[in-house]
Amino acid sequence: KNPWSVPYWQNLEEAYTRAMRNKGHEFSVGRVTYMYDGQHLWYALPSGRILCYPFAKLEADGVTYAKAAWKPAADATEWPRARLWKGLACENITQATANDLLRHALRQLDDVVLHVHDEIVLETDRPEEMAEQLERVMCTPPEWAKGLPLGAEVAIMSRYGK
């Protein structure tokens, strides 16, 4: 249980709601910034990557957006809508930031054969050396994530497994 999580969620909700009410203005929470352009709700991650809740609307019960990842019915005239709530906003930021960290690590490594969620798999004839490098790379945050505590559990295996 993290005592900062509930206030952070509330601050996120306040920021994206204020952005929806103030077209063209930016509202930040920590290192995340929201901006509504009149059609889409955009948010900038600490890495600088920009993500979007498409066709966002401020409704009586909160913010909704077009859930483009869902396949609509064949006769549907528009994408289904989903409700943006503070926990989902936090989850989206967390998952996207984790992805940015993974991609940062991948760009620094040779011998990568695959990655699964938060795991990186290397194939090498220098396992001990590469295990040390992998841990060092995965535990060193990029400039935009300075101060973020990172950890990695590295294992040497003859084939991929859990």
Descriptions of predicted regions:
Residues 1-162:
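Conserved catalytic core of nucleotide polymerization and phosphodiester-bond processing enzymes
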